[in-house]
């Protein structure tokens, strides 16, 4: 395993983590999302921003002043990893560090209009041993099969994927771009049921605040069949 992630314990009063990542082109505005998450979701949720030393070799000295000050004030945690795992580092390493707790994803270009983290956690099963993820999709995207990717935001139950070290293959992940595809492939390989989907549109939950496009979009210009074919190929490669 390339990264050495220490196990962590959440601060008193926290019940889950909100995980997000960012990169050079969005680092100057991610503070807006973090401040919004703190205000909307409150102290029950520990915010973790995962960044790569490969992309920010001088670490905090390269970050905007607002991020540094909020981090020092304890508003959120910066989790540094060595390699730039791109979008894959949003959930993976936070999930390793806080494996005993639910992990909720957030996007670095969004303002959240209400406490979505609390809503997602509410739908987790009471039995902690039961693996479940809860996400948002509107009707036209909601599917119940294994190939259902995560939606606009997702809550993963504790230790959702278990040990995933063997599936962290950088070159393969970079080729397929999308962390959502990787999550689908892992669910299929590990026989974890598909997500619970809450029927809400993107605009019900967030307002974008950054116009910089993502590096890659799994859904842009692809039919459902084309997307599923890509995921099938990805599963085959991961199982080798």
Question: What do these predicted ranges mean?
Answer:
Residues 20-22, 51-53, 135:
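Short beta-strand/turn micro-motifs composed of small residues
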């Amino acid at each position: 395993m390339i990264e050495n992630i220490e196990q962590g314990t959440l601060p008193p009063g926290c019940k889950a983590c909100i995980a997000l990542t960012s990169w050079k082109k969005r680092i100057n505005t991610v503070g807006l999302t973090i401040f919004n998450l703190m205000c909307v979701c409150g102290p029950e949720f520990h915010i973790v921003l995962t960044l790569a030393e490969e992309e920010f070799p001088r670490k905090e000295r390269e970050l905007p002043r607002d991020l540094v000050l909020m981090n020092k004030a304890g508003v959120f945690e910066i989790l540094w990893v060595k390699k730039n795992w791109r979008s894959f580092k949003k959930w993976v390493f936070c999930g390793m560090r806080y494996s005993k707790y639910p992990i909720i994803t957030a996007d670095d270009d969004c303002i959240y209009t209400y406490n979505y983290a609390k809503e997602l956690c509410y739908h987790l099963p009471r039995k902690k041993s039961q693996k479940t993820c809860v996400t948002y999709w509107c009707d036209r995207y909601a599917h119940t099969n294994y190939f259902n990717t995560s939606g606009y935001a997702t809550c993963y139950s504790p230790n959702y994927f278990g040990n995933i070290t063997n599936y962290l293959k950088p070159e393969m992940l970079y080729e397929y771009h999308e962390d959502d595809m990787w999550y689908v492939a892992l669910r299929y390989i590990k026989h974890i049921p598909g997500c619970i989907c809450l029927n809400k549109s993107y605009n019900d939950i967030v307002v974008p605040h950054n116009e910089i496009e993502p590096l890659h979009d799994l859904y842009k210009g692809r039919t459902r069949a084309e997307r599923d074919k890509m995921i099938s190929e990805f599963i085959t490669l991961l199982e080798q």
